[in-house]
Amino acid sequence: MNHAPHLYFAWQQLVEKSQLMLRLATEEQWDELIASEMAYVNAVQEIAHLTEEIDPSTTMQEQLRPMLRLILDNESKVKQLLQIRMDELAKLVGQSSVQKSVLSAYGDQGGFVLAPQDNLF
């Protein structure tokens, strides 16, 4: 049985999934991006399985090469966008930790509320 057309179609589907993931990352739709990751991983596994079953001809490898380049470029861009997001989250966590420390240090004043008074004299 000739699996070459099925392999080519699987690569096309992987390109589509890769482009979807890049769009989701660009639009900062992080939950949707994470949800789409499993379909992407499954598509990669299917390609690996099909590639083991057949030995793609040199011609087919040449046809698949541009798709592989596009997928790798998209993956690189998604990783860059994810790194930016992780840096943003790390900054927010750091700010939250500082705020918690300040509240802990100054918020527990033995039940007294420390506030400036208008009329001291």
Swiss-Prot record:
Residues 1-50 are annotated as: Required for homodimerization. It is found in: Cytoplasm, Cytosol. GO terms for cellular component: cytosol. The lineage of its organism: Bacteria, Pseudomonadati, Pseudomonadota, Gammaproteobacteria, Enterobacterales. Residues 60-98 are annotated as: FliD binding. Dual-function protein that regulates the transcription of class 2 flagellar operons and that also acts as an export chaperone for the filament-capping protein FliD. As a transcriptional regulator, acts as an anti-FlhDC factor; it directly binds FlhC, thus inhibiting the binding of the FlhC/FlhD complex to class 2 promoters, resulting in decreased expression of class 2 flagellar operons. As a chaperone, effects FliD transition to the membrane by preventing its premature polymerization, and by directing it to the export apparatus. It comes from the Bacteria. Keywords: Bacterial flagellum biogenesis, Chaperone, Cytoplasm, Repressor, Transcription, Transcription regulation. InterPro entries: FliT (IPR008622). This is Flagellar protein FliT. GO terms for biological process: bacterial-type flagellum organization; negative regulation of bacterial-type flagellum assembly; protein folding. It holds the Pfam family FliT. The keyword Flavoprotein does not apply. Homodimer. Interacts with FliD and FlhC. Belongs to the FliT family.
